[in-house]
């Protein structure tokens, strides 16, 4: 593992604020600003993927993620001809289980301090409109986040983003969810990412946790500014994010790869332990 050594100035302020805010929380001992990524990731950051390595969003393409083995370009980024972007990311979680992943995806969302554990430098705030879901009886882990919207403030690179992520049943996008178990997929977190305020679609996000001999591996895909699908009326005159002057899908895809690799490799360092301490009894 190699440490991340570039921290934009605003994220330097944020990590200090996060460290102070979390001090009196019972899980404060999991706050660790030392973040690192595997050496092989750096090669993926030096040049974009080739067009033939980009996975599409049709049901046929998405279900290639259920096939045994790996696809070309499991970790990488690129811009697309229409100005959109694409990010793929593979992160391994030794000693962890899909049950831990499902628990984390609802547990972290009810306090910003929990959220900051995941990426101390870039995660600023999170809240939900359904706080009662945290303690509601007789819900599965999936039911505590699928169908819910997480309101998030974070940095992707040096850019602060106010976004909303609505988590969905992956079958809605054409995944053969009935085939997940046979493919070794034990958990998922798929969602639509919208810009807060304008409700312009920022990304389509897929996380699939596939069981391995020593834990699980997380295979992620982001299609950035892939289509116009506002949940509410968009800002007048703007139909899609790629039409915004100065928007670069390629740059956003690159920064998303750095962010994803950093946060999920960091989560892998403490997920088994925090689940053991704060997970279900």
Swiss-Prot record:
UniProt key word Hydrolase: yes
Binding site for substrate: 115, 154, 205-207, 222
Any one Gene Ontology molecular-function term assigned to this protein's record: metal ion binding
Impact noted for substituting residue 115 to A: Abolishes activity towards phloretin
Result after altering residue 259 to A: 19-fold decrease in activity towards phloretin
Hydrolase recorded as keyword: yes
Keywords from the named record: Hydrolase, Metal-binding, Zinc
Catalyzed chemical reaction(s): phloretin + H2O = phloretate + 1,3,5-trihydroxybenzene + H(+)
Cofactor: Zn(2+)
InterPro entries: DAPG_hydrolase
EC number(s) per entry: 3.7.1.4
Record entry for activity regulation: Hydrolysis of both phloretin and MAPG is competitively inhibited by DAPG.
Outcome following mutation: residue 256 to F: Abolishes activity towards phloretin
Effect of residue 203 to S: Abolishes activity towards phloretin
Binding site for Zn(2+): 123, 154, 259, 263
Subunit structure: Homodimer.
Membership in a protein family: Belongs to the DAPG/phloretin hydrolase family.
Function statement: Catalyzes the hydrolytic C-C cleavage of phloretin to phloroglucinol and 3-(4-hydroxyphenyl)propionic acid. Can also hydrolyze monoacetylphloroglucinol (MAPG) but not 2,4-diacetylphloroglucinol (DAPG).
Protein's UniProt name: Phloretin hydrolase
Protein's organism: Mycobacteroides abscessus (strain ATCC 19977 / DSM 44196 / CCUG 20993 / CIP 104536 / JCM 13569 / NCTC 13031 / TMC 1543 / L948)
